[in-house]
C-alpha cells in the first residue's frame, strides 16, 4: 500500500477513535475516596494541578481531565488500560511503572493487589509545559496510596538501585528516547517476568525488514521530544536483541502499538 494512502487511513482511524470516545460512558465512582477526603477538598486539590495527563477517578463523580493520545477526554486513560491486558489479579506481584506521570497505571496496579508498586518519572517535559510530580502527589494523597515514587530516568535503572520487578510498564516513553536500545537494556535488567510496552510506531513501512525512522524536527504531534518511529518488525527485533523472549503485538491502531515480552 502506498505511504500516502496509509497516512490517509491512519488519519481516519484516529478521527474514528476520537468520535467513539466522545460517546463512551465509563462508570465512575460516587463514593468517597479511600482517604475519606470530603468532596470540596478533593475538588480544590484537583484544581491546584494546571495540567492532568491521566484521567483518575477520585470518587464523588470527580474524574481528572486527562489528555491521552491527543484525545482530551475523561475516558482516554481507561481506553488505553483496557488494551494493555494487565492481569486483573496482581496479588504478590511487584510492578514498575516507567514514565508514570500522574500515576494512573501505578494506582491501578496497586488496586489490583500488587504487593509493591514503584513509579518513576524524570518529568523531562517540565520545561515545556507541565508541572512535575504535583498531580501524582495529590492523587496519592486522595487515594491514600502506598505507591512509591522516585524521580528518575529509564537510564538510571539497575537491579542494585531499584530492585527487580515481576511486571514492568513502559508506556508512551520509548519514542521519546535518544538512546532506545540502551533504555531497553536497562528495562530488561530490572524485569523478572513480563514487560508491557506502549509506544508510537511507524505503520507506513509494515514489512518483515526491521526499519526505524528518525524524527529530527518534531514531526510527531509537533513535540520536540519525539525522536523515533520503529516499525513493528523492528520493535520485535530490538526486544529480542536485548534478551526478551517471545515478544508479541497485542494491540495496535493508527500509529500506536502495544507489545508484551517475557524474561
Where in this protein do the model-derived segments appear?
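Membrane-proximal basic amphipathic "stem/tether" segments
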Residues: 1-49
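Conserved alpha-helix/loop element of class I SAM-dependent methyltransferases that forms part
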Residues: 70-93
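Class I SAM-dependent methyltransferase SAM/SAH-binding core
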Residues: 104-151, 156
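A short SAM/SAH-binding and catalytic strip from SAM-dependent methyltransferases
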Residues: 166-179
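A short, conserved alpha-helix within the catalytic core of class I
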Residues: 176-190
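Conserved beta-strand signature within the Rossmann-like core of class I S-adenosyl-L-methionine
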Residues: 192-204
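Short, glycine-/aromatic-enriched active-site segment of Class I SAM-dependent methyltransferases
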Residues: 202-226
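Short alpha-helix
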Residues: 225-243
